[in-house]
Amino acid sequence: MIVIFNSDGSINDTDFSDYVQQGSNGANMLQMAYADSRREGMSAYLIAQRPNGTSITLPCHEASFDCNGEHYDGWQAAITGQFTLYAGAVHCTVDVVDGEEQIQANYPFDVIVNPTGNPIDGEWDEQINVAQYNSYMAQL
């Protein structure tokens, strides 16, 4: 699932079909070159659901994860913009440093594309983006 937010919090329904290719493992790959995403003013974010039900939103360069036998380091994801996507909620092993908290578990996650290019920096932005995500999910 790709969720795109405008700067005012509304949902952007941009067609990203040109970016989606079939991966070697049969999963859909969102291949968005880092330079292209920066030029178009977009940044990719990961939203992971903690076991207690709360969410964390963070730039992909702060996370590493494994999906269907493929491993993505944070810096790798930020540079290549390659993410394995499945229909609906996807469960992958996500290794996230959340402040002093080291999280490693199977979390569902979605890739969030923010057209403003503004980084998620600090608790306020994280809460705002999680609220946008929850609002979007409620519309489904």
Mark where each language-model region is.
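N-terminal assembly/attachment segments of tailed bacteriophage virion structural proteins
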Residues: 1-121
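Low-complexity, Pro/Ser/Thr- and charge-rich linker/hinge segments at domain boundaries
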Residues: 114-134
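Heptad-repeat coiled-coil alpha-helices
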Residues: 136-140
